[in-house]
Structure formats: structure tokens, C-alpha cells
A protein has these predicted regions:
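N-terminal intrinsically disordered, low-complexity, charge/repeat-rich segments that act as generic
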Residues: 65-69, 76-82, 95, 102, ...
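Amphipathic alpha-helical packing elements
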Residues: 26-57, 81-117
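Short glycine-rich, low-complexity/disordered patches
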Residues: 48-53, 86, 105-116, 121-126, ...
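Tandem-repeat/low-complexity and Cys-motif detector
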Residues: 25-28, 62, 84-86, 204, ...
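Short amphipathic alpha-helical heptad-repeat segments
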Residues: 2-12, 29, 62-70, 88
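Extended non-catalytic scaffold regions that mediate assembly and binding
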Residues: 14, 49-76, 112
């Protein structure tokens, strides 16, 4: 299995099984499995996970904290018709074991809570400039391939792999898509209104990081205020960004 392809293979496969006559409880268990794959990918841990799989002995026991999820995946795997699907499902079970053995069960639980809410995805790092981001990436002993980071308040995905150095980062329109979807659905009432950007920034600086996001107005114009708790980062985005 090519590890870089694992998330793109596993998440759609699990989603397909969720639509295939499972009970509500079973669908929720597959949500945990799907979230585990996404958590590993978007936090830049694919290569660490790959190394973990390589070093694991065959016939290893399931992760104790995820017994129900693993039992369901094993049942689905037994019934799967293709060797490729069986391999992917085994890798998903290994993903759960990796998360538990590396002490990241709480991190996964927090990530799953993000999945259940309408908010922006978390990032693992935030930088003011491209050069700061490149320096940080050069210092990583293992490329955090797939991780989300902020560079100048813009979402980027880490694309440096073990085989390829460039491109280091790829910009992704996460903010624009989030704003665009809310403009289509209709904005919620603003939680605060300010005359100037300075007033709004002062308010945001004292807003709990757990707020995640809020819609406000500055000079009568709608803005999105975002807090990234993990990296202690706050930012304001004018809603016109989605139209650019």
C-alpha cells in the first residue's frame, strides 16, 4: 500500500460502508474509524503511522480503547470481496492502534468533536511568512505530509514527502469555501459589532480560543473571526474573500 494514498482510499471506502445498511450505532463506530484516518493525515502523521505498521508484529491484538470499532471493521473485512479492500480495512484498524499506542486518544476525541461541528478545521502550526514556514518544514525529522498549517492566515497543506522535497506547501481555499457556504445558507446574526478593525482586533485578542469562530461586523461589513486553540492563533477575515 502506498501510504500517501491511504487516506484517499480509506475514507471513501468507510463512507460507502456507512451507507450500506448498517445500524445507527455501527455508522457511529465507522465515524470513529474515518475520523482516525483523517486525524492521522491532517495532523501530518502518515509516515509515523507507516513506520508503526512496519514495526508491528503480525497477529497483534486490537487496540483496547477501540474494541467495538475494531470488531466491526474485522467483520466488514471478512465479508469484503477484494484483497485491496481487506488491506485498507486492516490499515484502518492499525490506525486505531497507532493512535492509542502513541497516547493520542484524547487528541482524536477532540478532532471528532470538530468533525461534529460546523467550524473550520484545526491546524498544527501557524506562520506569518513563507520563509518561516519553510524553515519549520526543513527542521522536521519526518515530513508532516498532509498536515494543515496557516501561512499568513491562509490554509496550506504540507506536500513535502519522503521522496519529493518540492512543493513544500500547497494553498487550499478552506477559508473561502467556509465563507462561501455560509453566504449561500445565510449568515447567522453577528455576535458583536465594531466601528474599526482595531476595536475588533482588541475584542478578538480577549476572546477565548475555544470559541473557534464567530461572525461579526466592522463598520457595518461582515467579517469572520477565527480562533485556533492548538496554535494560539486568532485572525479576522472579510467575507468578500469568498468572492475573489
Amino acid at each position: 500500500m502506498i501510504i500517501e494514498y491511504f487516506p484517499g482510499d480509506a475514507m471513501p471506502l468507510l463512507g460507502r460502508y456507512q451507507e450500506d445498511g448498517l445500524s445507527e450505532e455501527e455508522r457511529e463506530l465507522l465515524d470513529v474509524a474515518n475520523g482516525a484516518v483523517a486525524f492521522i493525515y491532517f495532523t501530518g502523521q502518515l509516515y509515523r503511522f507507516d513506520d508503526f505498521r512496519t514495526s508491528r508484529p503480525s497477529g497483534h491484538p486490537p487496540a483496547p480503547s477501540f474494541v467495538q470499532v475494531t470488531e466491526l471493521l474485522e467483520r466488514i473485512r471478512r465479508e469484503a470481496s477484494s484483497a485491496e479492500e481487506k488491506e485498507i480495512l486492516l490499515a484502518v484498524m492499525d490506525a486505531l492502534a497507532f493512535i492509542e499506542s502513541s497516547g493520542q486518544k484524547k487528541g482524536l476525541e477532540e478532532y471528532l468533536r470538530y468533525w461534529e461541528t460546523d467550524t473550520l478545521p484545526p491546524v498544527i502550526a501557524a506562520f506569518k511568512t513563507d520563509s518561516e514556514a519553510e524553515t519549520w518544514l526543513d527542521e522536521q525529522p519526518v515530513p508532516p505530509y498532509g498536515a494543515r498549517v496557516l501561512i499568513g492566515n491562509q490554509y496550506h497543506s504540507v506536500k513535502r514527502s519522503r521522496e519529493r522535497r518540492d512543493p513544500g506547501f500547497l494553498p487550499i481555499p478552506t477559508i473561502e469555501e467556509f465563507i462561501g457556504s455560509h453566504l449561500e445558507e445565510g449568515l447567522p446574526p453577528a455576535v458583536a459589532a465594531f466601528n474599526t478593525k482595531e476595536d475588533a482586533e482588541s475584542w478578538l485578542a480577549n476572546t477565548p480560543l475555544s470559541t473557534r469562530h464567530a461572525f461579526i461586523t466592522i463598520g457595518g461589513k461582515p467579517h469572520l473571526a477565527v480562533c485556533q486553540e492548538r496554535v494560539n492563533h486568532r485572525a479576522l477575515y472579510p467575507l468578500r474573500r469568498a468572492e475573489q
